[in-house]
Design a protein with these regions (language model features):
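Intrinsically disordered, low-complexity terminal regulatory regions
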Residues: 2-94, 162, 166-186
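Short hydrophobic/aromatic beta-strand element in the GNAT-like acyltransferase core
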Residues: 65, 134, 147
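Regulatory sensory and allosteric helical modules in signal-transduction proteins
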Residues: 71, 75-77, 86-130
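A cytosolic small-molecule/anion-sensing beta-strand core signal
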Residues: 72, 139, 146
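Residue-level signal for well-ordered alpha-helical scaffold segments within enzymatic catalytic domains
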Residues: 98-102, 140, 169
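A short, aliphatic-rich beta-strand micro-motif
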Residues: 130-139
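Flexible loop/coil segments at beta-strand boundaries within sensory signal-transduction domains
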Residues: 138-143, 153
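Short beta-strand-to-loop transition segments that serve as allosteric relay/switch motifs
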Residues: 148-157
Length: 186
């Protein structure tokens, strides 16, 4: 798998270069990404409910951060979170990009510091992510349009057996039943 070199960035020791392995893009990336952009545009109106889902995911895992994001093109857009930042992040550095690459099972990294795919990843190297668990959010067409994930700065070796099932159930609750959309003016 090819590695990725991030541009020079400031570290506590001066300037550095990050080398790590980004997730591959799915074969259906073009249609998946377009669907994710539409989903994000539509779901943003339901921010209070998304925040409650993030809060619940954070509580289930007893972690520092939980969030709901859309992965569109080369960006991860964190739409709702509990305990952290919202905004845009480079897809190449986002662990959630692995969820959209392999969407049919929960993606869990108990110790990101020991996983060679993430050696050099700035979120891991800077101590922001030691543990990660994420589940895909699907649209009505079955495309992985978003991610519900939880992170913690320290690795978590012991995870409740049903925690990933609960995270999956919460991810399914993010996108409500599809309602007919009104036509978009051209």
């Amino acid at each position: 798998m090819p590695t990725h070199i991030e541009p020079v960035r400031r570290t506590q020791f001066g300037m550095g270069i990050s080398v790590f392995t980004p997730a591959p893009k799915p074969l259906n990336e073009f249609s998946r990404s377009r669907a994710a952009a539409e989903w994000a545009r539509d779901i943003i109106a339901d921010l209070p409910r998304l925040k409650r889902i993030s809060d619940e995911a954070k509580a289930i895992f007893d972690v520092r951060w939980a969030g709901i994001s859309a992965v569109v093109d080369d960006w991860q857009h964190v739409i709702a979170s509990s305990g952290g930042m919202l905004g845009l992040y480079r897809r190449s550095t986002a662990l959630s990009s692995y969820v959209v690459a392999y969407p049919y099972q929960p993606f869990c990294i108990a110790n990101a510091l020991q996983d060679e795919r993430f050696h050099g990843n700035p979120f891991v190297e800077d101590g922001l992510i030691g543990f990660y668990a994420g589940v895909a959010i699907f649209d009505a067409a079955g495309l992985a349009v978003g991610v519900l994930c939880v992170t913690h700065p320290q690795p978590l070796e012991i995870i409740a057996p049903d925690a990933l099932e609960l995270l999956t159930s919460l991810a399914r609750s993010v996108t409500p039943p599809v309602l007919p959309r009104s036509p978009v003016p051209e």
